[in-house]
Regions:
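Anion-recognition interface
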Residues: 1-281
Length: 281
């Protein structure tokens, strides 16, 4: 049995375009990415030790004939919480190409908080409390710390930075740049290139009424007889919208103090304009 391992990784950051890019890249005929977007194999010690390399390699077997084989565990960039990810990447995949998606810090934090509400992460429901106490919101936004850690293992030429705003504004250019970086035909254009995926603004939160109905026999019948558009209508009515984040001046200043130096470091290391995110530095 031929052993197939990835030769590129989308390392994060969450809520910075990783799902959109994963969706688009896996449509390319010379690229394979498994249906499981985020294996978390190299970051989470429990998965690494219990599942083992045979499980991980099975994910990529269908891509044996593809030039580029990759995965998109967005937590790999969170080097403060998952330091083993960069170590394992450097040890087992020294020639891999890394794509690092980043987003304006305040926007990424807000979007990540909304995603956590939808997925019911155990964190304070109040936005300000969550930002101050749920470490992943801030630590996933320490772009400078993360890039510095990866540059200690990989040369800069093997790391490609993707800006969320540029992916949104000029997807053809950004997508083509990623294809060139991965060494595959850059002329391929997916039919849905301009459509964003996994938008927090489109998400809604499960309510007790929705959960109760979801498990009931009328719901099982409805799933069989109702057309998809009508099912989506009822689901949307039974779920509640995600709350809006409230940025008080005090909270904004707290985040600025936490991330300002790190953001400056990232912009310098990445070779980006120091005024790219003026609100955060």
């Amino acid at each position: 049995m031929q052993r197939v391992r990835p030769n590129f990784f989308i390392i994060g950051a969450a809520k910075a375009g990783t799902t959109t890019l994963w969706h688009l890249l896996r449509q390319h005929p010379d690229i394979f990415m498994p249906e499981l977007k985020e294996p978390w194999f190299l970051s989470h010690d429990d998965r690494y030790e219990k599942l083992g390399w045979s499980w991980y390699e099975r994910l990529f077997r269908p891509g044996a004939n593809c030039a580029a084989v990759g995965e998109a565990s967005s937590c790999y960039c969170v080097t403060r919480l998952y330091p083993n990810a960069v170590r394992r990447l450097g040890r087992y995949f020294p020639d891999a190409r890394l794509i690092y998606c980043v987003r304006e810090p305040y926007a990424r934090i807000e979007s990540a908080w909304k995603q956590c509400l939808v997925t019911q992460h155990p964190m304070p429901p109040d936005f300000a409390d969550a930002v101050r106490t749920y470490k992943l919101l801030i630590d996933s936004t320490r772009y400078g710390e993360s890039l510095q850690a990866f540059l200690g293992v990989f040369p800069r030429s093997q790391i490609h930075i993707v800006l969320f705003d540029e992916l949104s504004r000029t997807p053809v250019t950004v997508y083509g740049g990623c294809l060139e970086f991965l060494g595959v035909d850059p002329s391929f254009v997916p039919s849905d290139l301009t459509e964003s995926k996994n938008r927090s603004a489109d998400k809604r939160i499960d309510t007790p009424a929705y959960l109760a109905l979801k498990r009931s026999w009328p719901a099982r019948i409805g799933r069989r007889i109702l057309p998809p558009t009508m099912r989506k209508f009822f689901v949307r009515k039974l779920k509640q919208p995600v709350a809006e984040a409230v940025w008080t001046p005090e909270l904004r200043e707290w985040v600025r103090n936490a991330l300002e130096d790190d953001t400056r470091q990232f912009l310098q290391l990445a070779g980006l304009d120091r005024d790219l995110w003026t609100s955060a530095v």
